[in-house]
Amino acid sequence: VDRSLLFVYGTLKKGGSLHSVLGNSSEFVGTYITEENKYDMHDVGCPIMLIDNDSYLLNESKGFHIRGEIYNVTPECMERVTTIECNAGYVPFIVEAHEENYPEGEPLKAIAFIYPHAYGHNAGSHRITEKENIKEWVA
């Protein structure tokens, strides 16, 4: 069975409201942090991860790293997640991420669902933590 690596950073994480969508066949790989700091995260009732416009347009890394979880998922699980995420306006995007406790290790490539464009002003949120240029959604 062709499985895929899925990077989740919000409601699909352990303890998140949609975690059950991953089902019993998904294998937790670990907690990972994106290699590049070209992302941002906003709280719009649920978290959205997007490419930081300034970092993208200027080809500079001025955004944030994102902490999330990587799962090894079945095609059926990926189809369920894709349906949910794409219906909510997200698009699949390949991210490279390293294991949180082993940053010098080989990064993994995984599919993340990100918001395709900037989402207005980020008013901040008590559910998004920021420490050492890493953002994380805390359910």
Walk through the language-model features, giving the residues of each.
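Glycine-aromatic micro-motifs
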Residues: 1-139
